[in-house]
């Protein structure tokens, strides 16, 4: 699996250390193992996880601004854990309301010795934002409207919302509340992944 990951990274133009690659493969191994009992993802094949979970997460890294991020509705740690591995100087709070997912995240944190993640079991609306975050990240979490409505209290003054989407969500962008606007839309290239992938970056229009 390490060789396949190395080939995917080379195809994507992403350079990682051997240690980072080893951690990513170890995470996939854990996800595959725990998935049998905990049903954490519909993807069953570890090689497919490399594309649909690992690469699909880390291609976002160049667009993130800041040091403190919160991954809302993280599920089994996506995209937060792969991003934490490739961005060791940033910190990621991994938020999910389901206890079984958070138990898995804590086990990953323990086994991979990831000091830059904080797994939290909470509903996003109830989670405090002190200190505020530089970025709020979501992948398959909610519509853009729901994301900014439920998470509006989390980013700081210059914080951003980063929403990973498939096809360009034109209707969702058009229905954003007036106090939020799209700063940019980035088309993402994920080797061996069928279909389009986009990153929608949203900012608050608060004066």
From Swiss-Prot:
InterPro entries attached here?
rRNA_ssu_MeTfrase_G, SAM-dependent_MTases_sf
- Enzyme class comes to transferase
Stored CDD domains:
AdoMet_MTases
Q: What is its main location?
A: cytoplasm
Pfam families registered for this protein in UniProt: GidB
> Which key words are in the record?
Cytoplasm, Methyltransferase, rRNA processing, S-adenosyl-L-methionine, Transferase
Its cellular-component GO annotations read: cytosol
What GO MF annotations does this protein's record show? Answer: rRNA (guanine-N7-)-methyltransferase activity
| Phenotype when changing residue 56 to A | Low level streptomycin and spectinomycin resistance
Give the domain of life. Answer: Bacteria
EC id: 2.1.1.170
UniProt entry tagged with the keyword Calcium: no
User: Could you tell me what reaction this enzyme catalyses?
Assistant: guanosine(527) in 16S rRNA + S-adenosyl-L-methionine = N(7)-methylguanosine(527) in 16S rRNA + S-adenosyl-L-homocysteine
Q: Where does S-adenosyl-L-methionine bind?
A: 73, 78, 124-125, 139
Localization per record: Cytoplasm
The entry's function note states: Specifically methylates the N7 position of guanine in position 527 of 16S rRNA.
The text of the family note is: Belongs to the methyltransferase superfamily. RNA methyltransferase RsmG family.
HAMAP family with a match to the protein in the record: 16SrRNA_methyltr_G
Q: What is this protein called?
A: Ribosomal RNA small subunit methyltransferase G
Q: Origin organism of this chain?
A: Salmonella typhimurium (strain LT2 / SGSC1412 / ATCC 700720)
């Amino acid at each position: 699996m390490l060789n396949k990951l190395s080939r995917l990274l080379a195809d994507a133009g992403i350079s990682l250390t051997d240690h980072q690659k080893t951690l990513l493969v170890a995470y996939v191994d854990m996800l595959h193992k725990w998935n049998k009992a905990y049903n954490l993802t519909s993807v069953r094949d570890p090689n497919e996880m490399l594309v649909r979970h690992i690469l699909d997460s880390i291609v976002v890294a160049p667009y993130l601004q800041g040091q403190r991020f919160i991954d809302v509705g993280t599920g089994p740690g996506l995209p937060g854990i792969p991003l934490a591995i490739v961005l060791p100087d940033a910190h990621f709070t991994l938020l999910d309301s389901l206890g079984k997912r958070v138990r898995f995240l804590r086990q990953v944190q323990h086994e991979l010795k990831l000091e830059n993640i904080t797994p939290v079991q909470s509903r996003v609306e109830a989670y405090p934002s002190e200190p505020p975050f530089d970025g709020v990240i979501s992948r398959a979490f909610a519509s853009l409207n729901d994301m900014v409505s439920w998470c509006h209290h989390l980013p700081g003054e210059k914080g951003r919302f980063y929403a990973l989407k498939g096809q360009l969500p034109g209707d969702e962008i058009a229905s954003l509340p007036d106090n939020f606007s799209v700063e940019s839309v980035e088309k993402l290239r994920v080797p061996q992944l069928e279909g389009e992938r986009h990153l929608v970056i949203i900012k608050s229009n608060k004066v």
